[in-house]
Every structure is written in structure tokens, then in C-alpha cells.
Design a protein with these regions (language model features):
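Active-site beta-loop-alpha junctions enriched in small/polar residues
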Residues: 38-40, 75-79
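Generic structural signal for well-ordered alpha-helices
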Residues: 22-23, 53-61, 130-134, 171
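The substrate-binding groove and active-site-proximal loops of carbohydrate-active enzymes
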Residues: 1-16, 39-53, 112-126, 154-163
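Conserved, mostly hydrophobic/aromatic
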Residues: 18, 25, 35-36, 72, ...
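Loop/helix patches that line or flank the sugar-binding groove of alpha-linked glycan CAZymes
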Residues: 64, 78, 86, 112, ...
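Substrate-binding/active-site clefts of carbohydrate-active enzymes
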Residues: 1-28, 46-47, 56-59, 65, ...
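Aromatic- and acidic-residue-enriched segments that line the glycan-binding/catalytic groove
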Residues: 46-53, 82-101, 197-215
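A structural motif
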Residues: 30, 38, 179-180
């Protein structure tokens, strides 16, 4: 009862405001948007996310009239639903129990019980990933792109459990699968997952959000400021990758 209907005048006004914000940035040269939690616009939506899809279609219909080449990437982790809503790409996220989670991070809370497919001698099984990816691909081919990612700000870096050779094979696979792959900053140089105390609700994710390591200089090239002024510390190791 606390939520107004999706076509209530106030809700439509909110949608129009979203359109204005998107148009503003596209007018200033942005190529598109990555949308966080794109599937969660309408609370208590049905399983098909028809309400949320309705809202996005309204928005895209107005934006694409003048910006048909703008790219929109969803953090939805359900490519068929994201395609129905009008997105160009959708992240296939590392979520417990899905196919992607079996590739690099199939260890739950116990890394000594790691069964990741790309980890040597872990006896991992790629079947669930292949079957789920094929299902998504068959339903989205020609409509939207599946985006596999090496990591993101909500996921432990692969470097935490995979060695360099395992990572090379894993990333080569990600970058040769159908779709649009995404490389998380720092993964290209082998940035490590840092074991840090949670900050601002980051919890375990905090260790994947440390500054980019550009050079071997002060603060690994991220800032000329004092080290204790950084939002999170850089890798303190003598062999920190840059």
C-alpha cells in the first residue's frame, strides 16, 4: 500500500526526470550508461519483471529518439529480461549457484573447498555454466549482448585463489565467448584482493575496491596526496603489480 502504481502521475514525473538526466549527459558527450540494480525499479514486481521492463521501455523510447547509438549496460544478471526491457548488454554476474560462479569462484565461504573450473586439480565442472550460458544466448541472440566480466566491485578478485596461468586461461575464455566482455580495472596487471576492514558497507567487497596501481611511485601512481588521505590503501607489498 505504500507504493504508488507505476503509471501514477508522480511516478511518470520521476521517469521523465530520469530521461532528462540521461539526455543531459549524452548531450555532453557520454556514450551511454551502466545501470546499477537495473532490475529493481519496481518493488514486489512479478517474476518476469514486467513493471520494471515497462519503466525502462518508457525511458528508452524517449532517449533513443535522439540518441539511437547510446549504449546501455544493465546490472540485471538475466539477459533475456534485460533484453525485453531494452538494454544493449547485461552483466552475467557472479551469483551463488549460477553457472558463472562455477568458473572462477566456486568456493563459497571455504576456499579450501574450491571447485572452480579454472583452478587446476579442483575437479570443477563447467556443465552448469555451459547450459545456462547457452540458454541465455539462445534467448538473446540478435537482441542484446551477454557481458561476462573478470570481476567487479562486488566480487573478490580472481587473483585471490587462481595463479597467473589459471587467470590467463580464464580471462582468455571470457574474452573469446560471444558477447561483450568487461575487464575490471587492475585485473589486467594482476591486482590483488586486499584483506581490509569493511568501509561504508563494503564488507568483503572492500578488498576489491582499492585504488588503481598505475606506477611504482608514490601511492602507486594513484595520488600525490598523503597515504592516509586515500579512501582505501594501495597494495603495500614490495612486489605490488603496476
Amino acid at each position: 500500500p505504500w507504493q504508488k502504481g507505476i503509471d501514477d502521475p508522480d511516478c511518470i514525473a520521476t521517469r521523465d526526470a530520469m530521461v532528462d538526466v540521461i539526455r543531459f549527459w549524452l548531450e555532453h558527450g557520454c556514450d551511454g550508461f551502466r545501470v546499477d540494480m537495473a532490475a529493481s525499479l519496481v518493488k514486489k514486481d512479478d517474476p518476469d519483471k514486467s513493471g520494471t521492463s515497462h519503466v525502462w521501455k518508457y525511458i528508452f523510447d524517449r532517449v533513443r529518439r535522439d540518441y539511437p547509438e547510446a549504449a546501455f549496460v544493465a546490472e540485471w544478471s538475466n539477459p533475456p529480461q534485460a533484453a525485453d526491457a531494452g538494454f544493449d548488454m547485461d552483466f552475467y554476474l557472479n551469483e551463488k549457484g549460477n553457472g558463472y560462479s562455477t568458473l572462477l569462484r566456486d568456493y563459497g565461504n571455504h576456499k579450501d573447498e574450491d571447485h572452480s573450473f579454472f583452478k587446476k586439480n579442483a575437479k570443477g565442472d563447467v556443465t552448469s555454466f555451459v547450459e545456462e550460458f547457452q540458454k541465455y544466448y539462445d534467448k538473446t541472440k540478435g537482441r542484446t549482448y551477454i557481458s561476462l566480466l573478470t570481476c567487479n566491485h562486488d566480487t573478490i578478485r580472481a587473483k585471490e585463489t587462481l595463479d597467473d596461468e589459471e587467470i590467463k586461461i580464464a580471462f582468455a575464455t571470457i574474452f573469446t565467448m560471444p558477447g561483450v566482455p568487461f575487464l575490471y580495472y587492475g585485473d589486467e596487471i594482476g591486482m590483488r584482493y586486499e584483506h581490509l576492514r569493511t568501509k561504508e558497507g563494503g564488507y568483503f567487497r572492500t578488498g576489491s575496491r582499492t585504488p588503481m596501481q598505475w606506477t611504482a611511485g608514490k601511492n602507486l601512481g594513484f595520488s600525490e596526496g598523503c597515504a592516509d588521505s586515500l579512501y582505501l590503501p594501495v597494495d603495500p607489498s614490495d612486489d605490488a603489480p603496476t
